[in-house]
Structures are given as C-alpha cells and as structure tokens.
A protein has these predicted regions:
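Transmembrane and membrane-interface helices of multi-pass
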Residues: 1-188
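Extracytosolic and intramembrane catalytic regions of membrane-associated proteins
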Residues: 113-117, 190-202
C-alpha cells in the first residue's frame, strides 16, 4: 500500500522535470537545457528527501506525518532561527545524511549521458510526442492511484485501506505526499464569543 503513495509523491515532486525531459524540442539536447534540467531534478528531490529526513526527528513529538499545517503552526514563532539552529545541532547526523543523499543523487545523475540524434526529422517529433502522451497516461494513473473510472486522486484518508489501526496510517504515508495534499487545507480560526469577564460571570 505504501508504494502507491510513494509513487504519487515522486511523480508530484518530479512533475516539472518529467515535462522538461519529455518536451519534443531539439533544444532539450543543448548543454544549457540539460544543466537546468539537472538542477530542477536535484532541487525537487532534495526537498522531498529533506522533508522525509526532517520528519524522522519531528515525528516522535507529533506522532503523525508532518502536513501543510506546519506553516501556520510556526507562522507566529519569534525565534524560528534559534529553533532551526538547535534542531541542526541536536540532529547533526541527519544533516550529514541529507548532504550525502544530494551528493549521491548528483553523481548518479551525471552518469546518464543524453545523446542528441544525428538528424532530427519529422519522425523525431512524432515519436517524442507519443512518448509524452504515454508518460502522461502513466502519470495520471500514478497520481490518482489507478486508472479505474471510479478512482480519484488518492488522499491521506486512503491510507486507511491498507492498515488495521488508524495510527498505522503513518507507516503507509510519506511526508512529501502528506505535505502536498494538505498545503491548501483550510485552517480553523479561533473565534471568541465571550470575553474573559463575561465567562467569569457565568
């Protein structure tokens, strides 16, 4: 079950990179284009990896996956820089792990050599366009969790289909998916109907 959410998260994170690679343009074989595509790949996946690594330390305090509500939770924090510094000091080994992952990703990426076709004919555009459509088909199925007509884009609640207890949903989910699916979540605002003086009189 967790694989379905991992695939969806990876597709969301790499959506821009996938588009850059599959666009049927001869320009994509230029060194400048390839360099920019590499940076898009590294930055996008570094964010995803960073969120998962961060949650390794954050989870014991919240007992749930980090969601988009974290931004509202820290929006009024006056000493955020101090908290971040203390986090990096306490979990310095996670920082090394994060840097190491980025280094490995960059090295593995450099092993892939993109070769420009000797001659770009009309068949090039046709094949590239068909490849784009095929990957788009796979992409839609991946982010939706399937291709069935009744299938909708999977959300956090779908993790309950693969566990026996609600607290086990965090094992199935991953942090990037949880963050992306809750960025537009509506935060409930605190409303005061009575003043403190009125409450004391009741």
């Amino acid at each position: 079950g967790g694989l379905k959410f991992d695939v969806a998260a990876l597709l969301y994170i790499n959506s821009l990179y996938i588009l850059l690679v599959l666009l049927p343009l001869p320009l994509k074989y230029s060194p400048g284009y390839q360099k920019n595509a590499k940076w898009v790949f590294l930055i996008s996946n570094s964010i995803g990896a960073g969120l998962n690594i961060m949650d390794y330390a954050y989870y014991p305090f919240t007992l749930k996956r980090t969601t988009g509500t974290i931004f509202s939770q820290f929006s009024n924090e006056q000493n955020f820089a101090g908290l971040l510094f203390n986090f990096l000091v306490d979990y310095w080994y996670l920082l090394f792990l994060f840097v190491g992952l980025i280094y490995v990703m960059a090295k593995l990426y450099d092993r892939i050599q993109v070769v420009r076709p000797e001659a770009i004919r009309w068949s090039f555009y046709g094949i590239q366009f068909l490849a784009l459509l095929f990957v788009a088909f796979l992409f839609v199925g991946g982010v939706r969790g399937g291709w069935a007509h009744s299938t909708r884009p999977i959300t956090l609640s779908n993790a309950g289909d693969y566990v026996k207890a609600p607290e086990e949903m965090n094992i199935v989910l991953n942090t990037p998916f949880s963050m992306l699916k809750t960025l537009k979540a509506i935060a409930l605002k605190e409303v005061d109907f009575y003043t403190s003086e009125a409450l004391n009189k009741i």
